[in-house]
Amino acid sequence: MDFQQNLITTIHDYTLALQDPVQLQQGLRDKPTTILIPCLMEEFRRPALRLIRSVLQELEELHQLVIALSAGSVEEVREAEQFFADMPFPVHVQWTNAPAVKELLSGFSDQGLDLMGPPGKGWAVWQGLGVAIRDAEVVALFDADIRTFTPAYPQRMLLPLLLPSSGVAYVKAFYSRLSLETHALQGRGTRLFVGPLLTALSQLLGDSPFLDYLQAFRYPLAGEFAFTRDLAVNLRIPCDWGLEIGLLSEVHRHVALSRIAQVDLGLFDHKHKTLGESPREGLQRMCSEILASVLRGLMEHQGTTISAEQVATLEVLFRRVGEDRIRQFALDSAVNNLPYNRHGEELAVQQFSSLIRPGLQRFQQDPLAIQLPSWSRLLSCASRLQDDLAQAGLDRCGDNDSAISLAPNARSECPSLV
């Protein structure tokens, strides 16, 4: 625990006073607030989502809970609705892959809009935001697999946006990733890839405002964040594992540093990923797509590219920084009496370093991201799309006519490419 501040405001957990629920409830009354949870059906079989539900039930003044659900059948969607049936606020279960949703969104292709993002968190977040920001001033996003969810999580994520005159538009979480079972350090993607990568790039490129910005976040891959409607409506949403870095890049594009905050949520644990057997699996795939997201941000914000001659230097720097971090994490674990698999960590850094050269080559061949357009762009030519999408996401009978009845009028506002 410290009190250091950096480029962005850091809200520490000083643990000296209990959270004040009255303060949060008053803020929720003053500013309509929605919590968004992207979710797979498998999460309903695990205890984490039940824990999250029990905590959120206490937020009586919450405007709405949006569940962006990928499900295989109407029966599964109804099961999800029943799961949240007793909440003291409205719950909208957006069936993201419903037939009506697919029919609605695919109809925009003739206007040059590809809204059928690959299935995953990015597409779910984009849909959930579209539904949430219709009438909410603040939106907070939490993953469905958080095993350590406490009342402090929504309180600390939301208060910076709800307090009068705070001026904050975007909040991102940071935390200590420890296994609940073994107490070992987790978060290899952040500790052993993103951290060493940003440091190595800074050493290679020198002065870099964008890299300084990313390094100001203590946990840049945190999937928990909150923002105002005015910001959310302007964000393009990445559709791969570069979602978190890509969103940070979008926030950097739209918001001054003084309007960004990060919040300490303390101990945090959720579902873990394996390293993967190939670069297209597990953490290896995730880190490859994160690398592309960082490189794209450097291009967009600074016009900076990594030349073929610099690749070898970046590989060497990454490996050295990664090995230095392992030494530091080993000592940190030893003093805190935590188990630490140093050999496993060394192997992970070696594997991550092998992703850099092919990852750079793939990025240079195709530097454009798979991004869903911002809602401000869509609403400029399809002003009723949010309502149509929400209606389609509620279709439970397989009869798409009622769910997409408004779509032709909405689409007609967009000029055809033909």
Language model region names:
Residues 1-13, 88, 271, 275-418:
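Terminal low-complexity segments of carbohydrate-biosynthetic enzymes
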Residues 1-57:
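N-proximal low-complexity "stem/linker" segments adjacent to membrane-targeting elements
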Residues 15, 76-136:
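Active-site-proximal specificity loops/subdomain of glycosyltransferases
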Residues 51-63, 82-83:
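Short, acidic, metal-binding catalytic loop of nucleotide-sugar glycosyltransferases
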Residues 135-147:
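Short beta-strand-to-loop acidic/aromatic patch adjacent to the donor-nucleotide binding site
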Residues 147-179:
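Conserved donor-nucleotide/metal-binding helix-loop-beta segment in metal-dependent transferases, i.e.
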Residues 181-191, 202-224:
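A recurrent flexible, glycine/aromatic-enriched loop bordering the glycosyltransferase active site
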Residues 239, 248-268, 277:
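Catalytic donor-sugar/metal-binding loop of nucleotide-sugar-dependent glycosyltransferases
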